[in-house]
């Protein structure tokens, strides 16, 4: 369990932790199951930013943007990189090999940049409506990591034989993936399902980038659903 915790925290946050001594399929499965709990420090950070912004009466949208920035910094913007690369891959070609090569190149194209701006804007605008409910916002940040349960479901193949995606793909049991969809809210779960279906058809499976994209899209959709209540 210690290795799984180190794997989850070290992969999903910028917190300094010792690397796991061993990473096998069981460690990867436990790490993905621990993902929402590993994100607890990130959720508390977002809650603190919202509470502080409200206390000093900053403009709500500015506070939302600061919260998104703090969240990105606390996870090394890893999920944002995944979102950008995934959208670039989807926009690049219908050839799976070429799309995967574009994703692996590490450069951001116009499609990826636009997707990042739009999703970040949605997150910030939704967080701006939750200034009086900072703990709820923090909880939603943690729950957004349940998207990884869906992407890493045993029914979803990996697009590559190497990389982070291959390490954690097909590790989460189907009942847990279904629970993850329910915890995300109908909208968040649906968005992740659409992403998974699309990437499996286009790439032949999921990658670490797709997992990052799923987290950011799930957070945006879930925050928006709560903001619309």
From Swiss-Prot:
UniProt entry tagged with the keyword Cell cycle: no
Cofactor (UniProt): Mg(2+)
GO cellular component: plasma membrane
Broad EC category: transferase
Main location: membrane
GO MF annotations, alphabetized: adenosylcobinamide-GDP ribazoletransferase activity; cobalamin 5'-phosphate synthase activity
GO BP field: cobalamin biosynthetic process
EC number assigned by the record: 2.7.8.26
Catalysis performed (reactions): alpha-ribazole + adenosylcob(III)inamide-GDP = adenosylcob(III)alamin + GMP + H(+); alpha-ribazole 5'-phosphate + adenosylcob(III)inamide-GDP = adenosylcob(III)alamin 5'-phosphate + GMP + H(+)
Stretches assigned to coiled coil: none
Pathway it works in: Cofactor biosynthesis; adenosylcobalamin biosynthesis; adenosylcobalamin from cob(II)yrinate a,c-diamide: step 7/7
Subcellular location: Cell membrane
Segments crossing the lipid bilayer: 31-51, 55-75, 111-131, 134-154, 176-196, 208-228
Membrane topology: Multi-pass membrane protein
Keywords noted in UniProt: Cell membrane, Cobalamin biosynthesis, Magnesium, Membrane, Transferase, Transmembrane, Transmembrane helix
Record-linked PANTHER family: ADENOSYLCOBINAMIDE-GDP RIBAZOLETRANSFERASE
Purpose of the protein: Joins adenosylcobinamide-GDP and alpha-ribazole to generate adenosylcobalamin (Ado-cobalamin). Also synthesizes adenosylcobalamin 5'-phosphate from adenosylcobinamide-GDP and alpha-ribazole 5'-phosphate.
Sequence similarity: Belongs to the CobS family.
Name assigned to this protein: Adenosylcobinamide-GDP ribazoletransferase
Lineage: Bacteria, Bacillati, Actinomycetota, Actinomycetes, Propionibacteriales
């Amino acid at each position: 369990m210690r290795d799984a915790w180190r794997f989850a925290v070290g992969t999903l946050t910028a917190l300094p932790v010792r690397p796991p001594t061993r990473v096998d399929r069981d460690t990867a499965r436990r790490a993905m199951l621990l993902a929402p709990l590993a994100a607890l420090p990130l959720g508390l950070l977002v809650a603190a930013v919202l509470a502080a912004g409200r206390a000093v009466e900053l403009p709500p949208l500015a506070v939302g943007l600061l919260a998104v920035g703090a969240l990105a910094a606390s996870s090394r913007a890893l999920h944002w990189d995944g979102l950008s690369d995934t959208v670039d891959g989807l926009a690049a070609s219908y050839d799976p090999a070429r799309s995967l090569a574009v994703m692996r190149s590490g450069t951001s194209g116009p499609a990826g940049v636009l997707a990042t701006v739009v999703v970040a804007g949605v997150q910030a605008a939704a967080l701006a409506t939750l200034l009086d409910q900072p703990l709820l916002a923090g909880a939603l940040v943690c729950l957004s990591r349940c998207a990884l349960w869906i992407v890493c479901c045993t029914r979803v193949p990996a697009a590559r034989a190497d990389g982070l995606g291959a390490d954690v793909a097909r590790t989460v049991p189907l009942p847990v993936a279904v629970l993850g969809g329910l915890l995300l809210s109908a909208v968040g779960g649906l968005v992740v399902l659409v992403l998974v279906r699309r990437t499996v058809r286009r790439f032949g499976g999921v990658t670490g980038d797709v997992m990052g994209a799923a987290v950011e899209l799930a957070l945006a959709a879930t925050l928006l659903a709560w903001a619309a209540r």
